[in-house]
Amino acid sequence: MIAMEIDLTLIGMEKGRQYETIITTSDADNVRNAAPIGVICSGKDKILNRIFKGSHTLENIISQREFVVNITHDPELFALSTLGNLPEDHFNEDSSLKCADAYFKCEVISLKEAVKQSDPIKKKGEAIVIKSKVTELVINRPAKAFNRSFGCVIETLANYSRFDLVDETQKEYYLDRFRECSRIVNKVGYKNDKLAMAEVKKELMKKWYEP
C-alpha cells in the first residue's frame, strides 16, 4: 500500500471522463455499504457523482460528508455490490475495499439537486450531484480506473465480425447494439474509442445499413 500525491491521472483518470467505480460509505453506527457508481473526474483532485435518492450510499454521503472511491476491475466485486451489500470481511477499517487496486478518500464540497432531461425518471429532485475533493490517494498495485467505452468497442467489433453471417433479424439486433454502444462511447469514451466506432459506422454504411 502506497500513499501517493493526490493526482487522479496516476490511476488513469482524465478530466471530463466518467469511470466505473465502487463507492464505499459508512453510517453513524459504522455500518458499511458498497455500491457501483460512476465517477466523473473534474480535476486532479476533484470528482463529481450523480446519485439517485433512496440509496444507502447517498444517505451516508449526506450524513457523513465523506466516502471512499475504490478502483477495481474485479467483476465479482461489481456484481456483489450491485445485487446486495458486500460482507464485512471485504472492508478495511477505513471503509476501503481490501481487494481494490487503488482507492481515494473524498470529502464533500457541495450537494445539488439535478435531473437530466434525458433521464427516464423525470421527477424533480430525484438525483443529487455531489462535488467532492480528494483528500488521500492510495495505490495498492498498478491501477487504471475502468472506463466502460472500451468494452463497448470490443462488443461492437465482435458483432461486426459476424454481421455478414447472420440473418436480417440478427443484423437489426447488432445495429441496435451498435447504436447503444455508440451512445455510451460518445458519452464517456476517449478519442480513440470514438474513432474506432466511427470506422465501424463507415463500414456498415458501405453495406447500405444506417447504424
Task: Map each language-model feature to its residues.
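Basic, polyanion-binding surface patches
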Residues: M1-P211
